[in-house]
């Protein structure tokens, strides 16, 4: 009984540790490790940023979800919230009039927002054998960091 109680307590403690301590990035491309540039931008944040992950329940993109977890654990100014468009169909219209694809991210700080569509996070190339596009790379970090930088910029030029 004491062993079981001890395991439960250890499990509760581990569940409250930040992602960077409990998960390791063994991918060759370091998909889940934030670059020094992103870490620097997040470290210098002086205002809160909401990252809304627009995704239907059960259709999450594991790569994007883990990346967002890294952002949230890297800065106390970043909060990630998953929004199911089936449950909240009008949510994205607060930030854009365009259609927002599943697995997209909306960065919001104050009155400023920026949509990062899921399609723009992946690099695609034409496979001439099958005449179809295939995913060949991932730049989710670059796109999300750019959005965070945009919504927290002191001077925004809107044309």
Q: Where does each model-flagged region fall?
A:
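Short, surface-exposed patches at the edges or C-terminal ends of soluble domains, predominantly
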Residues: 1-159
């Amino acid at each position: 009984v004491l062993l079981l109680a001890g395991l439960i307590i250890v499990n509760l403690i581990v569940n409250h540790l930040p992602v960077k301590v409990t998960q390791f990035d063994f991918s060759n491309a370091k998909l889940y490790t934030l670059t020094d540039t992103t870490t620097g931008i997040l470290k210098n944040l002086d205002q809160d940023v909401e990252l809304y992950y627009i995704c239907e329940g059960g259709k999450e993109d594991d790569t994007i979800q883990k990346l967002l977890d890294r952002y949230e654990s890297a800065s106390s100014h970043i909060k990630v919230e998953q929004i199911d468009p089936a449950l909240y169909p009008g949510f994205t219209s607060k930030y854009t009039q365009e259609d927002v694809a599943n697995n997209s991210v909306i960065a919001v700080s104050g009155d400023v927002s920026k949509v990062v569509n899921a399609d723009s996070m992946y690099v695609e190339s034409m496979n001439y054998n099958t005449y179809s596009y295939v995913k060949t790379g991932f730049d989710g970090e670059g796109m999300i960091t750019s959005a965070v930088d945009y919504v927290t910029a002191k001077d925004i030029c809107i044309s």
